[in-house]
């Protein structure tokens, strides 16, 4: 288990102190795939570097399996870091080494014999192959990394990260440099590794689609502060903070923030659907049963762990009484949440 307790990080700059992280409290269970999401500058990369103490927290504690990491001496910390590996946006492969030797590298540092290291590296290269294309990465074992595609490089990086049998895999924007299809294949691989090996995965990203596809739970970071956390389904169904709404419903969220796009007497609401309620023809039912017509400004649906979730931004009639009646009707429907954006 990973526990971040009252963690803060301050950088001393020429112009003064910069608070990158403030009072972070998170618990990540063993075997989970946990997302940490935020816009650029939110403090995501600083936070993930604090987990393995590449950055030492200014205040607070990082506790992994009951051990406060900041209390370890240099030798103890090096030993514990073998249990915590990391993959990056730019892969960080050693270009002067072949793919096989890249995977062997952390085992060399750990003193593993060459024959044993190469045997495990070959097994890992097979494991991270692209099942959809029936391509085992061992076929590229003698290739230099510059001959590989971005997705292939990331597969080699994942194999290298698994070389020391880690308990935790940190993914820092690991798919942000990849195209959508390759992103999906890499996320599928990470999910398979999590399921087969039981490795705890921490995913740092600015892409809600990544969290949606792979994560069990998520924390939303904004300005160095965790503003919201919970299950992915919970956050998608009912985002409470402005930061969460920007990430979960970027179209509806941006329209809702720009109040200048609405007239003073406009009545606009955000409607979210949870699970089976997405199949209900809410707008049509509102018109048929109440005779109230509304305009759909934006709409979106997502499938999360087999459950369908959706959201709509609706413009209601100008008459206040009619708009209020529409809100009351929608709120009476099971699995439907209505948030007033403006004008009611």
State where each predicted segment sits.
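Conserved H-loop
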Residues: 198-204
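A short, surface-exposed alpha-helical micro-motif characterized by mixed small hydrophobic
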Residues: 211-213
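Hydrophobic patch in the ABC ATPase nucleotide-binding domain
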Residues: 112, 137, 199, 244, ...
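ABC ATPase "signature
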Residues: 229-230, 238
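ABC family nucleotide-binding domain
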Residues: 1-188, 192-193
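Non-catalytic connector elements of ABC transporters
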Residues: 263-344
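C-terminal boundary and immediately downstream tail of ABC-type ATPase nucleotide-binding domains
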Residues: 237-266, 270, 290-293
């Amino acid at each position: 288990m990973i526990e971040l307790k009252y963690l803060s990080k301050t950088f001393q700059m020429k112009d003064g102190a910069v608070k990158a992280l403030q009072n972070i409290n998170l618990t990540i269970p063993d075997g989970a795939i946990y997302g940490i999401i935020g816009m650029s500058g939110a403090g995501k990369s600083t936070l993930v570097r604090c987990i393995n103490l590449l950055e030492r927290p200014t205040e607070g504690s990082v506790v992994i399996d009951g051990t406060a990491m900041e209390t370890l001496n240099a030798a103890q910390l090096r030993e514990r870091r073998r249990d915590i590996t990391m993959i990056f946006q730019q892969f960080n492969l050693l270009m002067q080494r072949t793919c096989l030797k890249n995977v062997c590298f952390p085992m060399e540092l750990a003193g593993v014999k060459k024959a044993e290291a190469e045997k495990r590296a070959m097994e890992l290269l097979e494991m991270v192959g692209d099942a959809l294309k029936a391509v085992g990465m061992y076929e590229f074992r003698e290739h230099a990394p510059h001959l590989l595609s971005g997705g292939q490089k990331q597969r080699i990086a994942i194999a290298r990260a698994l070389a020391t049998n880690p308990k935790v895999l940190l993914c820092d924007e690991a798919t942000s440099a990849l195209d959508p299809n390759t992103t999906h294949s890499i996320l599928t691989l990470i999910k398979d590794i999590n399921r087969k090996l039981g490795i705890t995965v921490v995913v740092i990203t600015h892409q809600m689609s990544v969290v949606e596809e792979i994560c069990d739970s998520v924390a939303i970071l904004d300005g160095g502060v965790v503003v919201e956390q919970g299950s992915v389904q919970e956050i998608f169904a009912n985002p409470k903070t402005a930061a969460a709404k920007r990430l979960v419903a970027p179209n509806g969220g941006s329209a809702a923030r720009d109040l200048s796009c609405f007239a003073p007497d406009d009545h606009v609401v955000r409607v979210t659907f949870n699970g089976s309620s997405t199949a209900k023809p809410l707008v049509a039912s509102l018109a048929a049963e109440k005779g109230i017509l509304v305009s759909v400004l934006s709409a979106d649906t997502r499938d999360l762990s087999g459950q369908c979730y959706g959201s709509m931004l609706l413009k209601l009639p100008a008459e206040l009484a009619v708009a209020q009646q529409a809100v009351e009707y929608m709120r009476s429907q099971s699995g439907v949440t209505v948030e007033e954006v403006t004008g009611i």
